[in-house]
């Protein structure tokens, strides 16, 4: 699932940092 960080969606399977 996509995680949301800094107001930007992460790519599927990748978590935003």
Curated annotation (Swiss-Prot):
Keyword Glycoprotein among UniProt keywords: no
Keywords: Secreted
Cellular localisation: Secreted
Tissue: Expressed in skin glands.
Record-stated family: Belongs to the Frog skin active peptide (FSAP) family. Septenin subfamily.
Disulfide bridge map: none
Protein name: Septenin 1e
Function, as annotated: May act as an antimicrobial peptide.
Domain of life: Eukaryota
GO cellular component, one term: extracellular region
């Amino acid at each position: 699932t996509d995680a949301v960080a800094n107001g930007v969606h992460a790519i599927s399977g990748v978590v935003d940092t």
